[in-house]
From Swiss-Prot:
Function: Catalyzes the conversion of dihydroorotate to orotate with NAD(+) as electron acceptor.
Gene: pyrD
Any GO MF annotation of the entry: dihydroorotate dehydrogenase (NAD+) activity
Protein name: Dihydroorotate dehydrogenase B (NAD(+)), catalytic subunit
PANTHER family: DIHYDROOROTATE DEHYDROGENASE (FUMARATE) (PTHR48109:SF1), DIHYDROOROTATE DEHYDROGENASE (QUINONE), MITOCHONDRIAL-RELATED (PTHR48109)
GO biological-process terms attached to the record: 'de novo' pyrimidine nucleobase biosynthetic process; 'de novo' UMP biosynthetic process
Length: 304
C-alpha cells in the first residue's frame, strides 16, 4: 500500500501535495526543472470564457511573511487553453484540477461545460472569490445563497467532480461551506487569499495599482488552519487545504486539522522545487511522528 496515497472524488493522488492555482501556470515552466509526475495533482491557472489581460501594474507587492497580488485573472481564454495548454499536460499521469473563474454565472457554466473535454482534467476548482458583476460586484463566495446557486448550476453541466474554492473574506465560513455542500459540491478547496493593502510612504498611495490585493503566504496559515478545522467539525466533505504552506510540518498540520490533501502556493515563487521537496520529506517526518499512513491519520482524525 502507498502510505501517501489519497482518494477523493475524481482524484487518485499518489501523494497529498500539489501546486496551487495561479502559482504554477499550466506547468510548462516548472516541467523544465522536475518531472511533473512526482506531484499528487496540479491545480492549473484560472480559465475564463474569453482572454483577459488582467489588472494594471504594479500588481504584486511583497509583505512581511507573504505577498499581495491583484493579477486580475490574466489568462488566454477557454479556447486557447483547450487547444494549447491542456494538451501539454496530457502527457503526464498527474491529474489536473482546472480552475474556473467568471464574472457571471453563465461564464462559469460555459467553461465548466467544456473544460472536461481534456482527458487530463479530472476535476474542476470553482473560484468563487470573483466579483459578481450582475450583483454590484459582490464576490460569489460571500453569500451562501449565491454560492449555492452557482455550485448547483455548474454541477448540472460539469463532466468531472467539482471542488469549490472558499473565500476567507466572510463572517461565517461554515455557513458558506454547508450551502455549497448542499448544492452537490464534490469537495472544497480552502482558503483563497485574504484581502489586504500596502501603502507607499513616498507617494502616500497603495503600492498595488488596483488598491487592494490578495494576501498569501505564511502570514495566512493560522487563518487557513482555523477555517479548515471549523468546516471539518461539521462536515465530512473532502477538503484540499492551502494557505501559507512552507514546510512538511505545515503539510501535516493541515492534514490533522481536517484537509485530505494540501496545495502549495506562494512558496513556488521562492523555491520552484518546493513541492517535490515536501513530497520527499513527508515519509521521514511521518515516521518520526508515528504516522503509519495518511489513511490511518484520517481514521484517527475521524475517531476523535
Amino acid at each position: 500500500m502507498n502510505r501517501l496515497a489519497v482518494e477523493i472524488p475524481g482524484l487518485s493522488l499518489k501523494n497529498p501535495i500539489m501546486p496551487a492555482s495561479g502559482c504554477f501556470g499550466f506547468g510548462q515552466e516548472y516541467s523544465k526543472y522536475y518531472d511533473l509526475n512526482e506531484l499528487g495533482a496540479i491545480m492549473a491557472k484560472a480559465v475564463t470564457p474569453e482572454p483577459r489581460l488582467g489588472n494594471p501594474t504594479p500588481r504584486v507587492a511583497e509583505t512581511a511573511s507573504g505577498m499581495l497580488n491583484a493579477i486580475g485573472l490574466q489568462n488566454p481564454g477557454l479556447e486557447h487553453v483547450l487547444a494549447h495548454e491542456l494538451p501539454f499536460l496530457e502527457q503526464f499521469e498527474t491529474p489536473i484540477i482546472a480552475n474556473v473563474a467568471g464574472a457571471t454565472e453563465d461564464d462559469y457554466v460555459q467553461v465548466c461545460a467544456r473544460i472536461g473535454e481534456s482527458k487530463a482534467v479530472k476535476a474542476i476548482e470553482l473560484n468563487i472569490s470573483c466579483p459578481n458583476v450582475k450583483h454590484g460586484g459582490i464576490a460569489f463566495g460571500t453569500d451562501p445563497d449565491v454560492a449555492h446557486r452557482l455550485t448547483k448550476a455548474v454541477k448540472n453541466v460539469a463532466t468531472v467532480p467539482v471542488y469549490v474554492k472558499l473565500s476567507p473574506n466572510v463572517a461565517d465560513i461554515v455557513s458558506i461551506a454547508q450551502a455549497i455542500e448542499a448544492a452537490g459540491a464534490d469537495g472544497l478547496t480552502m482558503i483563497n487569499t485574504l484581502l489586504g493593502m500596502r501603502i507607499d510612504l513616498k507617494t502616500r498611495k497603495p503600492i498595488i495599482a488596483n488598491g487592494t490585493g490578495g494576501l498569501s503566504g505564511p502570514a495566512i496559515k493560522p487563518v487557513a488552519i482555523r477555517m479548515i478545522h471549523q468546516v471539518r467539525e461539521v462536515s465530512n466533505i473532502p477538503i484540499i487545504g492551502m494557505g501559507g504552506v512552507q514546510t512538511v510540518d505545515d503539510v501535516l498540520e493541515f492534514l490533522i486539522a481536517g484537509a485530505d490533501a494540501v496545495a502549495v502556493g506562494t512558496m513556488n515563487f521562492t523555491d520552484p522545487f518546493i513541492c517535490p521537496k515536501l513530497i520527499s520529506e513527508l515519509p521521514k517526518r511521518m515516521d518520526e511522528l508515528g504516522i503509519s499512513s495518511l489513511q490511518e491519520l484520517k481514521k484517527e482524525r475521524t475517531n476523535q
